[in-house]
Amino acid sequence: MKRMIALDGAQGEGGGQILRSALSLSMITGQPFTITSIRAGRAKPGLLRQHLTAVKAAAEICRATVEGAELGSQRLVFRPGTVRGGEYRFAIGSAGSCTLVLQTVLPALWFADGPSRVEVSGGTDNPSAPPADFIRRVLEPLLAKIGIHQQTTLLRHGFYPAGGGVVATEVSPVASFNTLQLGERGNIVQMCGEVLLAGVPRHVAEREIATLAGSFSLHEQNIHNLPRDQGPGNTVSLEVESENITERFFVVGEKRVSAEVVAAQLVKEVKRYLASPAAVGEYLADQLVLPMALAGAGEFKVAHPSCHLLTNIAVVERFLPVRFGLIETDGVTRVSIE
């Protein structure tokens, strides 16, 4: 019998990432775990619908036995079984993030006995989670370089608080892993601005695009009007295509916050990224730790290593026989497997 790994959910940033990473790694390695103080660092601790959906999805895919899988629970015991490929559908029942549920279960399906399709309904444009376009346009091309082949499709948008969005991913088992090397970004090829609107006046998007264009030379300026029943909602994105990587940044609009202020938040974030030669942005770095660890080798450079990143590394090192090294030089941190 494999040893039970004990995790403290209050460590590091104290959020849901500890639980999601632990679920992924437990499914892959077959190691059971117990976690206490779940989301202790949040205003509303314990399992929310999004986290509970991730737990139940993981349990279904690998026939796990679970203790503590209920709303508000701050303790969970997860004993995994065998991962099975196939077609799965999960409903969050709120505007909780579809992509974070997918992020939890897809790594295990890289090792399944056949191809899979996972569809999740819930929120698609959440200020604290990567949108589907980030997964599709930024992360998945990098996963393909590692040898991981999956394809994400956004079927319907769902903004907070109504939700109702749908995201699906098709994934194939990994034949072999390659080493990812991401150093400097290189020269910028082009930058593209995009605004999504659902039940929001078009002039909001026009003002947001104008704010972006006031700071950057945009190759494309796209405004997409979605059906009213998918909102109300508004998201502003800016994609930076460079010689060695494509990065994408976004901000979700808020009630009583002007279009100019929303877009200015995005401008600030992109300028922060461009101020460093590092290829990888703060949020992408979080997503690369697990696939790189599974490959057993690789490195990337990031200007601003987040608490999320450090927490994720700590959890990965509990489950896998790998050690990460972080070396900071001239404001750029090199993250590598030692």
Swiss-Prot record:
It catalyses: a 3'-end 3'-phospho-ribonucleotide-RNA + ATP = a 3'-end 2',3'-cyclophospho-ribonucleotide-RNA + AMP + diphosphate. One of its GO terms (molecular function) is RNA-3'-phosphate cyclase activity. Coiled coil: none annotated. ATP binds at residues 103, 283-287. Its EC number is 6.5.1.4. GO terms for cellular component: cytoplasm. Keywords: ATP-binding, Cytoplasm, Ligase, Nucleotide-binding. It comes from the Bacteria. It is found in: Cytoplasm. PROSITE patterns: RTC (PS01287). Pfam families: RTC, RTC_insert. SUPFAM superfamilies: EPT/RTPC-like, RNA 3'-terminal phosphate cyclase, RPTC, insert domain. GO terms for biological process: RNA processing. InterPro entries: RNA3'-term_phos_cycl_insert (IPR013791), RNA3'_phos_cyclase_dom (IPR023797), RNA3'_phos_cyclase_dom_sf (IPR037136), RNA3'_term_phos_cyc (IPR000228), RNA3'_term_phos_cyc_type_1 (IPR017770), RNA3'_term_phos_cycl-like_CS (IPR020719), RNA3'P_cycl/enolpyr_Trfase_a/b (IPR013792), RPTC_insert (IPR036553). This is RNA 3'-terminal phosphate cyclase. It comes from Escherichia coli O139:H28 (strain E24377A / ETEC).
